[in-house]
């Protein structure tokens, strides 16, 4: 049976390491955790933890691709701190453009795509900090823009 205190220590250490923004591979994270006393850690466990905590790869200040946590996130919901990662929402005649904090665009796009056509979203394309979203049939770009603003409680 797992020791809950040990598991909690592992999670704290894992999050602290990712906040350093210097690990470019899962293997490097495994080695760092082993150095901190977590002997039974392996690459598959690190991979599951990266997924569970919504870690993304982004460029650090040295322009290196590293793993980081965009925010304290579990499963993305519109009431979670995820909305704090949305910096701006604008639109033109074709698409709604959403600007996010670096590394957060794919997570936000995943949430939008999960809402789907019923909410007016045909699909999204995400880069590192920008998302293009297009409206589903029967919705205007302006309606989609307003729906996204409401979703993330932004000002109109």
UniProtKB/Swiss-Prot annotation:
- Can you say where in the cell this protein is located? Cytoplasm
Coiled coil segments of this chain:
none
Q: Enumerate the SUPFAM superfamilies for this protein.
A: C-terminal domain of arginine repressor, Winged helix' DNA-binding domain
Question: A single Gene Ontology molecular function, please?
Answer: cis-regulatory region sequence-specific DNA binding
Associated pathway: Amino-acid biosynthesis; L-arginine biosynthesis [regulation]
Q: Which family does it belong to?
A: Belongs to the ArgR family.
The protein's name: Arginine repressor
Origin organism is Yersinia pestis
